[in-house]
């Protein structure tokens, strides 16, 4: 499994790719498992990635500083 983590500082959103790259339209459904934490799935139910909104309030600041920033 190839994992990738990105952080968009302007949007304060992080994304953990469990499949990379995710092609346009590949994510067919999502579930918000907790406020601001969303799981993306393909058409077969395979977990593609995790989106974290308001990431700076949820994730460790050090972790965000050590990620690829968009």
Task: Label each region the model flagged.
Residues 9, 41-42:
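Short, acidic, Ser/Thr-enriched surface-loop or helix-capping motifs
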Residues 57-69:
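A short, polar/charged loop-to-alpha-helix boundary motif
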Residues 29-33:
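Short loop/turn motifs at secondary-structure junctions and domain boundaries
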Residues 22, 54-57:
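A short acidic/small-residue loop/turn micro-motif
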